[in-house]
């Protein structure tokens, strides 16, 4: 028996740990084991001891190790494989990419800047690029998907140290698996090497204080479409200036490396754009490499070099990168490299929801706040990866901007969780309903899920005393003279309502009688109901709260359980505090 219990404990401890950021809870694991294997309750003491031992072991592992073991032993628990398999049809229907059939190998990439956490908008390039990798892999093509952290701006777009792991966690949750991973701040020597090569072949030059081409003059001349002195200088002179940059001879703002482009371009930003700049490493240390470097490549230079060296064949990204694609062209041209095929898709806008990274950062909320459109926030709220995949693949890679409602996401999510979520009763703004004419005992048999009778029922017993019994109902459900059916319990006729109390006659348990009188069916809570509050996200950083009573069975559920409160909506159990259950509203 011990080996079987140990396996169960390991499985559920890993699931619990992965769900709650690497830390499993003994009580939650024990509850899950007993719920699935009630025959083990007779050996409760031994089971608890085994679980404690296993939980200690699991909690000593890193989150990555926990995920790896869970994926190896119980891959279905992560849901990632199911997500991808269910979306196979949508993936196959994606439009073909240019020359994909002619190339022997296809390589895609997702390249986030770890200056913030992934949100619904940034999930789009991750899912789209990975979906194309799968599309062609399913056809037998050699296809790769690369995760690349673009973190070479410690000054303006300063990386967050915890964002690297947070992004990895979000991608795994989405079911996105990468074949290779790179971090640009680990590749500085490579960028320096190619900067020298570009300067040597005349494709770049240095603008520096005291060089005959002052930075302020260079900016003015560029706007005028005129060259600066060092633009035509010998490469040896520019290499000398570049070495001085690396040695720390120039302060921030005193030297840059510029890529030669077209000074007559109608877009001034394309004219001789900055490839490297000096950043004060003591004032702006990089969170990963500290003050090791003072000369940092700009986004477009590092991306162009990496896309070539990593063999990227197709780039799928947002319309806002169109100018960047043009800028990067000049690096590819200078080296004689072939630029990847680039497909630009429109912006994804969610009605009434802020997806701007700069706006979200200013709110100073935790990344998993249930009001945020971050993937961590959506996951915490109860949105599934399957729903996000459905939404992103529905929008596709159209060039036009797409504006959708959150209702679209909720509709996709409802399809996923409706068959999984068992039904429970919750009474908002409760009033005590005193029933007259009841026997010593009445029972309600409530199905766990009306569409899945094999899940069974739960029995709620109400004890009568002297012909009376008490239950709780929603204040708006009772009016004098109204006949209602208390779900699964019986039919009552409301006699009077006064403040927080009401009185009704118990008139039988016949379902047929209720139908004939067209009695509305209402949810209710027994006398031993538990206090509960439901947090309802209204907008980013804003919530309202519904207080009420939940049936006792809800208190026995594992934290994180998604359920449907009858006549209310889908909710997720977040925990409890001071004897009150805390849940978050997902959607109706």
Swiss-Prot record:
The keyword Cytoplasm applies. InterPro entries: Gln/Glu-tRNA_Ligase, Glu-tRNA-synth_arc/euk, Glu/Gln-tRNA-synth, Glu/Gln-tRNA-synth_Ib_cat-dom, Glu/Gln-tRNA-synth_Ib_codon-bd, Rbsml_bL25/Gln-tRNA_synth_N, Ribosomal_bL25/Gln-tRNA_synth, Rossmann-like_a/b/a_fold. Keywords: Aminoacyl-tRNA synthetase, ATP-binding, Cytoplasm, Ligase, Nucleotide-binding, Protein biosynthesis. It catalyses: tRNA(Glu) + L-glutamate + ATP = L-glutamyl-tRNA(Glu) + AMP + diphosphate. It is found in: Cytoplasm. Its EC number is 6.1.1.17. GO terms for molecular function: ATP binding; glutamate-tRNA ligase activity. GO terms for biological process: amide biosynthetic process; glutamyl-tRNA aminoacylation. GO terms for cellular component: cytosol. SUPFAM superfamilies: Nucleotidylyl transferase (SSF52374), Ribosomal protein L25-like (SSF50715). A motif ('HIGH' region) lies at residues 112-122. Belongs to the class-I aminoacyl-tRNA synthetase family. Glutamate--tRNA ligase type 2 subfamily. Catalyzes the attachment of glutamate to tRNA(Glu) in a two-step reaction: glutamate is first activated by ATP to form Glu-AMP and then transferred to the acceptor end of tRNA(Glu). This is Glutamate--tRNA ligase.
